[in-house]
């Protein structure tokens, strides 16, 4: 009997030791911190271009990791870009071709695969579609575009309005999750998603005042007349002078506009229902009106300065001077919102450092697409032209990625899901269409053989009136077809014409290049399962939807 009792005692001691061992055992797969801003142009990150703003915290990732100079998107518009990132598929296969079409919720997203593989997952900030992101254990997300001031968040258990500035709040939520909700026995996938610097570019009040006093260098193509391109560039509604709104965008008091009576040029534009509309004071007050009295008092100081300047000087300005005024107003607010993003990225990176998390955490900084900062006289995105087609991409992974390296390889947001899955040693679904960036991250560049990428934009006729188009882009050339109500081709020599000012499609000197690019474009369309039949399918869906609206 004593022997039997002794055996039981030994058994329970062994079990207890095993239990303790299991409790303290850690999963050593890498954590992933995915940081994405909305409409953050690569020109507004100082590691890419330091003429407009200094971004020391975001630059840390370039200094301590890899910077991609030819990163680009598959469809330069918010929700479709995010759907591509989540699914690893082009818009025509994941179904999210534009901001208005529903996302196919049967699609598998990479956070779902991470959760299934034992990762703890969380998402804070702007998703832009749906109110219940799949595959995340914890979330607070903005409804749709969300608001800059005192924003509402949709949560897993309840919705809430949080007082403050959205960029700070998203960071507070992220750091609070790290402090109070992280399971240290599991690796984490954190989706840290900023609203800024999306239109209408409302800065925090102190940044609003600071940046209003700054002046910024103009792009060389600010006064582009689109003379050597087709109809798409000429008909787009993205021009600073003729389409940027006085009240909502430039933040002139509606009362000032009313007092002045007539302000030229009159801003008229097409909305998502194809209706011709004018700017309305509600577009200003829907943002400003969210502020409480003390917040308004801070904003009013700068708002009064803007309106006083506008009222005094606008009537005597010529069109060139008005264009320059609008450019400065645009840059002051856009860059002020980015300054807040950079400050807050620094807060999160510092938290990782201070809590010994940096060493085993892959940190990614990107944007859902690029953005025009006055190039070609434009704001917004959508086109295959470089400023909207290209996007920033910085990745840090200590002991895996050599610090301070630069890659000019053609990579896309299509590749993110497969990259993260491979890094986490999770099986990659066969229907994902990208390629893992792991060879480029780990110095095995010889294993990377992509020479060109495919692009397809759909949201037309709609806001900004950028025509539907698809194309192929290599390091040297860009071939694009605009379709639906036109059938026009454009070809750009990216080395000789980096600003994409001269369409050489009809130039006989480029005949062999043009023919080769046509063949390669068709090859890419077959590879990625796109076709004219799919074009017609989505056009018919668009027409049916608009018919039902009317």
Which ranges hold each PLM region?
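Formylglycine-dependent sulfatase
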Residues: 2, 7, 17-483, 487-489, ...
């Amino acid at each position: 009997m004593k022997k039997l009792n002794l055996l039981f005692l030994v058994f329970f001691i062994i079990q207890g030791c095993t239990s303790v061992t299991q409790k303290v055992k850690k999963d050593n797969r890498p954590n992933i911190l995915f940081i994405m801003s909305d409409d953050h142009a690569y020109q507004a990150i100082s590691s890419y271009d330091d003429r407009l703003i200094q971004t020391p915290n975001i630059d840390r990732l370039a200094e301590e990791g890899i910077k991609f100079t030819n990163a680009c998107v598959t469809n330069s518009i918010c929700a479709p870009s995010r759907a591509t990132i989540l699914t690893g598929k082009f818009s025509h296969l994941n179904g999210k071709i534009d901001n208005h079409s529903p996302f196919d919720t049967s699609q598998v997203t990479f956070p779902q695969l991470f959760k299934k593989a034992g990762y703890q997952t969380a998402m804070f900030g702007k998703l832009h579609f749906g109110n219940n992101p799949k595959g995340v254990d914890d979330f607070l997300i903005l409804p749709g575009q969300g608001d800059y001031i005192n924003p509402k968040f949709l949560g897993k258990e309840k919705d809430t309005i949080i007082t403050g500035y959205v960029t700070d709040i998203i960071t507070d939520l992220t750091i609070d999750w790290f402090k109070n909700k992280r399971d240290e026995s599991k690796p984490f996938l954190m989706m840290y998603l900023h609203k800024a610097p999306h239109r209408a570019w409302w800065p925090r009040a102190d940044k609003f005042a600071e940046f209003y006093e700054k002046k910024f260098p103009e792009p060389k193509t600010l006064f582009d007349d689109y003379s050597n391109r087709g109809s798409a560039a000429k008909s787009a509604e993205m021009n600073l002078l003729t389409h940027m709104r006085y009240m909502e965008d430039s933040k002139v008091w509606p009362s000032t506009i009313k007092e002045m009576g007539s302000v030229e040029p009159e801003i008229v534009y097409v909305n998502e229902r194809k209706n011709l509309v004018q700017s309305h004071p509600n577009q200003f007050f829907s943002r400003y009106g969210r502020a409480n009295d003390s917040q308004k008092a801070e904003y009013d100081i700068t708002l009064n300065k803007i309106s006083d300047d506008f009222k005094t000087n606008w009537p005597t300005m010529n069109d060139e001077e008005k264009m320059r005024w609008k450019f400065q107003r645009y840059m002051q607010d856009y860059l002020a919102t980015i300054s807040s993003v950079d400050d807050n990225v620094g807060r999160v990176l510092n938290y990782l450092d201070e809590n010994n998390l940096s060493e085993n955490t892959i940190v990614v900084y990107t944007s859902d697409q690029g953005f025009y900062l006055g190039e070609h006289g434009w704001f917004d995105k959508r086109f295959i032209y470089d400023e909207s087609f290209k996007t920033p991409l910085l990745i840090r992974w200590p002991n895996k990625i050599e610090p301070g390296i630069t890659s000019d390889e053609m990579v896309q947001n299509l590749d993110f899901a497969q990259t993260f899955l491979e890094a986490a040693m999770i099986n990659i679904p066969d229907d994902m269409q990208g390629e893992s960036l792991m060879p480029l991250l780990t110095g095995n560049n010889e294993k990377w053989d992509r020479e060109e990428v495919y692009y397809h934009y759909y949201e037309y006729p709609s806001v900004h009136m950028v025509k539907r188009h698809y194309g192929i882009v290599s390091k040297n050339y860009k071939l694009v077809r605009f379709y639906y109500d036109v059938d026009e081709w454009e070809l750009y020599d990216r080395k000789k014409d980096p600003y994409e000012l001269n369409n050489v499609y009809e130039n006989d000197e480029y005949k062999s290049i043009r023919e080769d690019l046509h063949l390669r474009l068709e090859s890419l369309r077959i590879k990625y399962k796109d076709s004219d039949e799919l074009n017609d399918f989505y056009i018919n869906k668009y027409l049916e939807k608009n018919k039902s609206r009317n």
